[in-house]
From Swiss-Prot:
Similarity field: Belongs to the CDS family.
Pfam families referenced in this protein's UniProt entry, alphabetically: CTP_transf_1
Name assigned to this protein: Phosphatidate cytidylyltransferase 2
Enzyme class: transferase
Modified sites of kind Phosphoserine: 20, 32, 34, 36
Presence of keyword Transferase: yes
Chain ranges passing through the membrane: 78-98, 129-149, 165-185, 212-232, 261-281, 338-358
Reactions mediated catalytically: a 1,2-diacyl-sn-glycero-3-phosphate + CTP + H(+) = a CDP-1,2-diacyl-sn-glycerol + diphosphate; 1-octadecanoyl-2-(5Z,8Z,11Z,14Z-eicosatetraenoyl)-sn-glycero-3-phosphate + CTP + H(+) = 1-octadecanoyl-2-(5Z,8Z,11Z,14Z-eicosatetraenoyl)-sn-glycero-3-cytidine-5'-diphosphate + diphosphate; 1-octadecanoyl-2-(9Z,12Z-octadecadienoyl)-sn-glycero-3-phosphate + CTP + H(+) = 1-octadecanoyl-2-(9Z,12Z-octadecadienoyl)-sn-glycero-3-cytidine-5'-diphosphate + diphosphate; 1-hexadecanoyl-2-(5Z,8Z,11Z,14Z-eicosatetraenoyl)-sn-glycero-3-phosphate + CTP + H(+) = 1-hexadecanoyl-2-(5Z,8Z,11Z,14Z-eicosatetraenoyl)-sn-glycero-3-cytidine-5'-diphosphate + diphosphate
EC number in record: 2.7.7.41
Amino acid sequence: MTELRQRAVREDAPPEDKESESEAKLDGETASDSESRAETAPPPTSIDDTPEVLNRALSNLSSRWKNWWVRGILTMAMIAFFFIIIYLGPMVLMMIVMCVQIKCFHEIITIGYNVYHSYDLPWFRTLSWYFLLCVNYFFYGETVTDYFFTLVQREEPLRILSKYHRFISFTLYLTGFCMFVLSLVKKHYRLQFYMFGWTHVTLLIVVTQSHLVIHNLFEGMIWFIVPISCVICNDIMAYMFGFFFGRTPLIKLSPKKTWEGFIGGFFATVVFGLLLSYVMSGYRCFVCPVEYNNDTNSFTVDCEPSDLFRLQEYNIPGVIQSLVGWKTMRMYPFQIHSALSTFASLIGPFGGFFASGFKRAFKIKDFANTIPGHGGIMDRFDCQYLMATFVNVYIASFIRGPNPSKLIQQFLTLRPDQQLHIFNTLKSHLTDKGILMSALEEE
């Protein structure tokens, strides 16, 4: 009798309630079914994406050594490409960073699309790329305003875009937000919000951190090259130590990682970071901030190096003196800051472990098959993004000070009466300190 009464109540329920119940049920089935399918799916099979030339040349080797040579050859090719783009200068580097960012975004969004494409979500891919455009417009607009200030103030259209940049950015994002709301359809509400969150988390991880990479680049190419090179060195040396000496598994998320590779990569990266920092600190083109020259309409990297990049003498602790026989040693202060290579080798790999967990959750081996033996672009940059964020925070906390050129640029945009007020205030301050009179006497 109780069951009959409950059935009668359900049958007497309004149509709207019935629809909402069925919709909630379908949403629940959608989420749970997709999760169960992901959990019960077979392990990913390895796809041989090795070029045919290498396949023929390495056909007599075992799969282990074949993978060693494929990874090694492609790694050398990528390092050569890295040297070429460094030679081409900061503008090319900035464009490469943007291209890498777009490719990484594409790889992550494609995974989501492949998982849920059977549900035919409306506008999912279109809105994902639209939000990427909006966020890039915001961040790159901020960068252009900050580092191309004189150029922006000189051109009327750019000045207007700069003045209302944040309002325009917000309007663009709001348009995408409204488009998403209008695209919501019954039976897919929960799934559509899943993908909305997926897109925004991807934007946070990829676009925001690539923007920080560009900021590091403008602080001086050394802040761009050394951190990236340390991560590359750690990847290579950890793989080599693990390949030859690896016996003890490091973490379940990535079974091929070993403690031997982790420790060997750590020491090799620290030594490499110190040596690379010493070499690069002697060149102005690497240590000077990248600035826009209004007269030549180009970037310049010429300056008087700061104390951070001038050789100084340091006393060696007594314990070490007895071992090496030296009382003092000359080194660049930047080499002390190159201890950030410690971060690259101790914390940086956790970016890779995070990516491994993500791939295991979706039963995929790599983000893509862009680079034979390595996977996708995101497989190569999972540690780089974490490193870029750390370097940017490190510079802001311990290195960066007021930038005189930027202050002068802002000063020149003020009204004449405001400029005169600042001039008189500065003159009074320098006179009270005795700095102005001393400068006049020296002249």
